[in-house]
Amino acid sequence: YMKKITRKLLLALCAFMFLSNMAISQEQKSFTIDKLSVEGRVDFDYEHGKTSTSGIGGKFFNFEMKGSFLNDFSYRIRQRIDMQGSGSKTDFMILSYHAHKNWSITAGKMPLAVGGWEYDLPPIDVYFASLFWNNFPCYDVGAQVEYHSNNKKHDIIFQVTNSTFTPDKFSGMYAYNLIWYGNVGLLKTAYSINMMEQKKGEYINYISLGNDFDFGKMHLVVDFINRGFFNQSDFLFGDFSLIGEVKYAFNDKFTLMAKGGYDRNKHSYFKEVEENGIMIPQPQAYDMTVTPGVEYTFAGLGFEAYPYKGNKNVRLHGFFAFNDLKEPADDMLNPNSSNLELQFNLGVTWRINFAK
C-alpha cells in the first residue's frame, strides 16, 4: 500500500512541476494557473482514555491548482491524500462560468453548502472539532448558482448535489442547499438552510448559523447547527451542535486559541404507532452524523506559530483538549457512562506555492 502511495506522490509531484513551468513561462493569458501548490501536515498525538496511545503520523497531503481560461471560466482542483490510510480523495474538481459580474454558475465535485465557520475550514486547518464535523461527509457532485453583490460583501448560493448520505450516486437522492456569506461590519456570516435526502423521500433539514466576529487581533466564532425532520415534535433544539472559538493574534507570528463545543441528539430511533389500540414502536428516520441518544462535549486550548516573519508557509501548532462522548447503552436510549478522553498534540504544516 505504501508503494502505491509513494508512486502516486511521485507522479503527482512530476505533474505539478511540469505545470508550474507552464505557469511561469505562459504568455497567453487566455489560460492561467493562478495557484499551484502542495501542502502537508504531520502531527504527534497522545491520547489518554480507557487506554493510552501515542504516535507520529502524517495527517494530510494536498495538491491544489486553480486558475482561469477564456476570460469567463475558472477552475479549481484539490486532491487530498489521507496519510492515515484511507486513500486519496477529491475535494474540489469544479468549473465555473462567470456569466456576469453578479452571477456565476459552478459544477463538479464540491463541498456541500452548509453554514458554519468550523465546517468552512479546510481539513488541514482543523485541530480538534465537533462530532458533526468529524462525521459529516461534506464533498459531493452537483451544481450551484451564485449571486455576488456589487460591493463584494455578500454571496448567495443555491446548490443541488447528490445526497451525501448514499454511496449509490445513481439512487435519485439529492441535497438542496441555500447559503448566505455576508460581511456586515464586524460580523461575517455563513448562514444556510439545507434539505438532504437520507432515504427516498425522507429529508433531514439543517438550519446552520455561522458567525465570525472580527475585533482586529481577536476573532470570535460562534456556530449553531440545528438538525431534524419536520415530523419530529422537537424539531428545534432536539438535535443540534453549538461550537465556539476565540483566537487572539499577539502578532503575525503567534496566535492563541480556545475552542469548545457541544453536540446533542435527544431524538429516538423509534416512534410510537398505534395498531389495534396498542402503541408499538416503529423505526423512524434519524440523524446519521450525531445519532439518537448521543451527547458529545469537547474543549481545548492551543496555539499557532509562524517561525518566519511575513511568511505563512510553515506553521507550528499545538493543543491540549478533552472530549466526553456519552452514547446510549441500548436501542431504548438508556444513558451510558461517559467516555472521557484527553488529547495532547504538536504538529507542523508546510506549504509550497509553485505559482501565485
Label for each model-derived stretch:
Residues 43, 48-51, 70, 98, ...:
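Outer-membrane beta-barrel pore domains
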Residues 21-22, 105, 150, 209, ...:
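Compositionally biased regions
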Residues 27-165, 172, 181-183, 257, ...:
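Outer membrane beta-barrel
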Residues 90-92, 142, 175-177, 206-208, ...:
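Conserved positions at the start
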